[in-house]
Amino acid sequence: MEAKRIRYPIGVQTFDKIIEGGYLYIDKTGYVHELADTYNYVFLSRPRRFGKSLLSSTFHSYFAGEKDLFEGLEAGRLRKEWTRHPVFHFDMSTAKHLNGGQLQRILGYKLSEYEKKWGADSGIAEDDINARFERLVKAAVENTGEKAVIIIDEYDAPLLDVMNDRERLVPMRQIMRNFYSPIKSLDPYLRFVFITGINKFAQLSIFSELNNLQNISMMPRYSAICGITQSELEKDMKEPVRDLADSQGVSYDNALQLLKHNYDGYHFCHGSEDIYNPFSLIKCLDAREFGSYWFETGTPTFLLERLRKNPMDETKLDKMTEIAQSDFDISPELTEDTLPMLYQTGYLTIKGYNKEDHSYTLGYPNREVREGFLRGLLANYKSSEGMSASFVLKFNKALKDNDVNGSLELLQSFMAGIPYDLENKTEKHYQTIIYLVFSLLGYYTQTEVKSAVGRADAVCRTKDRTYVFEFKVDGSAEEALKQIDGKGYMIPYKKEGRCVKVGVNISSATRT
């Protein structure tokens, strides 16, 4: 008899549906109980698709007194009294891509659903959303005799898409500030407030007025509140990993290593254990294939716009040092720096910490993020991710087949096809493109490889050859070859067998 197939909660973000439907669930309810028992106001920042909505839903069920759902879970064991509180749960991810009028209406609709439930229609003007919100909470408390709970999931979602458009941002921000403003004055009526998001918008009343709002985003004991740890993977997902290993024709231990290499590596404070991206991990185990699942859902538009407006040195993203802790929480409104946003959105994570000056080193968390992000950056030069991906595959194959001339012809064609409006003809521009191309070739390729007296642009290894590349802009191939010899770039690879030096010149005029 075939074993019962595991139900993976793909697209399922509500706690009750997961528990009642018998879906795979990693128990995080101990965190929920501890936070509810310790704080009154909590804020958590995590990247998209990292489990924030499921955690919000878990808080909802916990405070709604749905005891049966927690049977056999940590919170069910710890909690003694299951008081039913009126819960106001606002999912702001449904309020994206709107203008001011649409945002006002959808917030009003969210309130009206609760007003019907609690009989809070007091004749307040429909567009007076803050007064309606305040009256609603008070009515629920009066009707039940229990303090209320407010859960705001993805609180910043309505603002993210207009973040780079100040003309639209200012009125939208005012609407959201107005909506959130009653929370402080409602303190006597509130048992608990839980807020999630990606960024920390400084000019919203949530952060300026709620002085007792506890930001747990970088607190070590809550580093694994979202996502999946190695111990959780090996304890609760052993059979899915075995199934993946069988499907891929590798050992169980090799499957674990591949999962770690592709989807692990997130750190939300210094000294924390590695955290897996739960979305990609579960998608991989369900499909039994290693894929770029997080990137299939798309890179946020606001991030791409910010990167175009404020370009970064892509060659240094894998090791950004001397980042202060205050940079992690900096509001996107108050800085043009893209780096904090890359951390907040999950494209970079903490890789190191210096205790002396309290600075952090950031880098890509894993292979999925690194390759997906580099592909996206390369696509910015070609205005088409599909064309860029196809080129990298062909270029990779030519090198593996030791067809250097063919690979250079492909590179020439790729460079010539870059739209003029994306090309600035500086040497740094071409260096960046070369870096992106070679970084995407795979594990056997290294970029900017140091030797004793210099740094080679790229080193590529095939089964029987090692290629050392040097590129010049508006110079000559002969100059590049002389630099390889003069700087001793090939010396470390002589013992590996057949070494080939490749000097390439790029003309900024013809881009060939």
Could you tell me what each predicted segment is?
Residues 394, 398, 406, 461-464, ...:
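Extended alpha-helical scaffold and adjacent linker segments that couple domains
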Residues 170-174, 473-491:
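Mg2+/Mn2+-dependent nuclease catalytic core
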Residues 149, 465-467, 500:
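Structural motif
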Residues 1-426, 441:
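Phosphate-binding site recognition
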Residues 434, 458-473, 487:
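Conserved catalytic cores of phosphodiester-cleaving nucleases, focusing on short active-site segments
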Residues 140-144, 437-463:
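Active-site metal-binding core of divalent-cation-utilizing nuclease and nuclease-like domains
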Residues 477-481, 490-512:
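Nucleic-acid nuclease catalytic cores
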